[in-house]
Amino acid sequence: MKRIRQSIAALEKAVLAGGDGVSEDVKFHRAIADAARNPFLIGTLEYLGQFLQGATRVTRANEARRADFARQVADEHEHIFQAIEAGDVAAARRSAARHMDNAIKRIEQADPSFWQEEGMKLAHPLVTSLHPGA
């Protein structure tokens, strides 16, 4: 629990200092997987790690452009933490699913200028790693 809480604090600190918070965000998700002691979840995160860093870079850049998005993410992380801390597996699962669903919605609601500017640059390495030759 301590690592999860520390990762939330580190993420907030990084963003307040003007950083993108990508590394800290990925560490938050890894801390949850480690706390769950679920080998499948840990293995999946390790495998997806090659894509997770790039995807998180895209989502964090989009969220940094809008205070409402940034606040939503912070609130979602806090809800996940609180559910885990309370030992409420169902609430943790719902909170995590909501976080993933909302991440997709935030990308869908990204300002078109995001994709014309940094979004496309950030997403390109991710797309080419998934679809070589793209």
Where are these regions (language model features)?
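Conserved amphipathic alpha-helical segments that form helical-bundle/coiled-coil interaction surfaces
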Residues: 1-61, 76-82, 91-106, 110
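Short alpha-helical linear motifs
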Residues: 25-29, 66-73, 114-122
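Short C-terminal domain-edge/linker segments immediately following a structured domain
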Residues: 63-65, 76, 124-126
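Low-complexity, flexible helical/coil segments
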Residues: 69-70, 78-83, 117-120, 129-130
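Interdomain hinge/lid region at the active-site interface
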Residues: 74, 86
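C-terminal effector-binding regulatory domain of bacterial HTH transcription factors
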Residues: 89-134
